[in-house]
From Swiss-Prot:
Belongs to the RapZ-like family. PANTHER family: RNASE ADAPTER PROTEIN RAPZ. One of its GO terms (molecular function) is GTP binding. It comes from Dechloromonas aromatica (strain RCB). GTP binds at residues 57-60. This is Nucleotide-binding protein Daro_0070. ATP binds at residues 8-15.
Length: 281
């Protein structure tokens, strides 16, 4: 059985991810109490259900403390388990709740929205590092759906998943990054009016950047660094490694280098690529 477990902060996109998985053929269960997880999986195995996605949130209360043990038990039973933890900056969550006008699930009478968000963050903190952390701050629903689709369509198998992520420093450093490389010192196509409308996946930008020695040297240096230390991360039993590449706006230099790195490592690991602040995503 393939099991994708989703948890994280309310308002960070769990429902968006779960809906995409349901559309992709997964048997989905939302807001499942932790104590019921192994019971549900046992029942679905008897029914020969092979693809399952379950969302668990803070409404499980202190039952959240039981989750690490439940996950270990499921892994020992031979289930192919993936755990995704979604989160966002507090200001992003406040904005989303303001726009949706929905009530926070942990909000109590006399408690502010900020207090409810912080209480939920504290409650879920012990499980936030059990799997792959995804910072959805600034991500639109369609971008999150595309990321989940790319994730589940990636070549299955054991081993580490290597994510190359581009971003713009003016929007902030992604909190889910394990390694961050700053490429703002490289020549910037933004200052060429003819190149500005393109992005780092377009041939005019690729040709411009690959014609600059500094770009090629930094690109190759980053690849060597990742290649040198990747075995160490694998030995540490890491399931995921997110390498973030940042330029000023996240449109040209970082996008090009993230795409190039994804191509370089495609035959050495399970590779994903994401462009956090690319226009139109």
């Amino acid at each position: 059985m393939e099991l994708i477990l989703i948890s994280g902060l309310s308002g960070s996109g769990k429902s968006v991810a779960l809906n995409l998985l349901e559309d992709s053929g997964y048997y989905c269960v939302d807001n499942l109490p932790v104590v019921m997880l192994t019971v549900l999986i046992g029942m679905l195995k008897e029914e020969h259900v092979h693809k399952v996605a379950v969302a668990i949130d803070a409404r499980s209360g202190h039952g959240i403390d039981l989750l690490p043990g439940k996950l270990d038990k499921l892994k020992r039973s031979g289930i192919n388990l993936t755990f995704l933890f979604l989160f966002s900056h507090e200001e992003t969550l406040l904005k989303r709740y303001s726009e949706s006008r929905r009530r926070h699930p942990l909000a109590t009478k006399g408690q502010t929205l900020e207090e409810a968000i912080r209480a939920e963050r504290a409650l879920l903190d012990p499980i936030s590092d059990l799997g792959h952390r995804i910072d959805t701050s600034g991500m639109k629903a369609n971008a999150l759906r595309e990321w989940v689709r790319q994730f589940i369509e990636a070549e299955p198998g054991q081993g580490l998943t290597l994510m190359f992520e581009s971003f713009g420093f003016k929007y902030g450093i992604p909190l889910d990054a394990d390694l961050v490389f700053d490429v703002r010192c490289l020549p910037n196509p933004h200052y060429d009016p003819e190149l500005r409308p393109f992005n780092g996946k377009d041939k005019p930008i690729i040709d411009f950047l690959e014609g600059e020695d500094e770009v090629c040297r930094m690109r190759d240096d980053i690849a060597r660094f990742v290649d040198t230390w990747l075995p160490c991360y694998i030995r540490d039993n890491r399931n995921y490694l997110t390498v973030a590449i940042g330029c000023t706006g996240g449109q040209h230099r970082s996008v090009y280098i993230a795409e190039w790195l994804a191509g370089e490592f495609a035959n050495r690991a399970r590779v994903l690529v994401r462009h956090r602040t690319l226009a139109g995503t």
